[in-house]
Amino acid sequence: MSAPTILIMAGGTGGHIMPGLAVAEILRQRGWQVRWLGNPDKMEGKLVPARGIEMAPLRFQGLRGRGVTALLKLPLLLTRALLQARKHMAEIQPDVVLGMGGYVAFPGGVVAALRRTPLVVHEQNAVAGTANRWLARMAKNVLTGFPAVLPGADNVGNPVRADLCDLSSPAQRYADRQGPLRLLVVGGSLGAQALNTVVPQALGNIPPAQRPIVMHQAGAQHLQTLQADYAKAGVQAECVAFIEDMASALANADVLICRAGAMTVAEVAAAGVAALFVPLPHAIDDHQTANARYLSDAQAAWLQPQHVLTAQWLADWLTQRDRTELQAVAARARAHARPDAAAHIADVCVAAARRQS
């Protein structure tokens, strides 16, 4: 008897791809065969094959906000993508299809529904993306990373790496800390220019005796400029292009300043760290603000829109923080963690396949 097969559809950004890979790893451990539907020219084209997962190529991308000419091309591009998806689906014969978001998931999800192959959809953000809003109407199971995102959906959380869930509690980590606060600044793998600009200025406005110790992930293309900005502000800082061991960096931090992508918010909760979220202002549907509010509304994080994030405001905010408060916020964040999210999604996929057989 051949192993059951799942086709995972996700692409475009790490926020869609990494949760899919987490589910893939669990199902492979259970003896499942995993295939992936994605665009080989995008991020998944590197990340997925590197995990030993065979990818079925499908080139389809979002046209939202690209003007009238792009919309006129949509019928042709969508038809081509549907035909590609049908070909791959006929060859793979999956027992269940899992859509994790990104435009590449839409044609595959439509074909799965037409073939009556069980379709499971997971939406990571607090505001559903275009593809998942449509696919949710066709899916057997709809799962979300945040509450009240799609009608009738089951909120299971967002999959995160096990090393984050395995960190000791905030109370244990903060117990013996003394001296200046430890500040971690993360703008994503590419950095966040607004944070790179404001944070050095803010720390320069804080007297040296009160100034936090800072580690700042800049993004490779901004590293030299960031180092120069800290030097200009008279601030010693550990500036890095990319943090390989994020679990250790979060564990060592008293306070984090970061964007509010769905996976970032999930990782903040899983690690149990006090965070100031500065949402990406131009994200589609302002979904990062909605993501951040999941924790900030519960007093489990802070939220500051980028347009009012000034160096003086941030300097004042940092000097008002102390470890007692930060530990309490970190503990509330961890209370919102969903460490079983990947396993829960895998369980739903297995059950959907069994119901069909």
Curated annotation (Swiss-Prot):
Domain of life: Bacteria
Gene Ontology CC entries for this record: plasma membrane
Enzyme Commission number(s): 2.4.1.227
Location (main, coarse): membrane
Location(s) in or outside the cell: Cell inner membrane
Bilayer topology: Peripheral membrane protein
Signal peptide range in chain numbering: none
GO biological process: carbohydrate metabolic process; cell division; cell wall organization; lipid glycosylation; peptidoglycan biosynthetic process; regulation of cell shape
Family the UniProt entry places it in: Belongs to the glycosyltransferase 28 family. MurG subfamily.
Primary role: Cell wall formation. Catalyzes the transfer of a GlcNAc subunit on undecaprenyl-pyrophosphoryl-MurNAc-pentapeptide (lipid intermediate I) to form undecaprenyl-pyrophosphoryl-MurNAc-(pentapeptide)GlcNAc (lipid intermediate II).
Protein name from the UniProt record: UDP-N-acetylglucosamine--N-acetylmuramyl-(pentapeptide) pyrophosphoryl-undecaprenol N-acetylglucosamine transferase
Lineage, uppermost ranks: Bacteria, Pseudomonadati, Pseudomonadota, Betaproteobacteria, Burkholderiales
Name of the encoding gene: murG
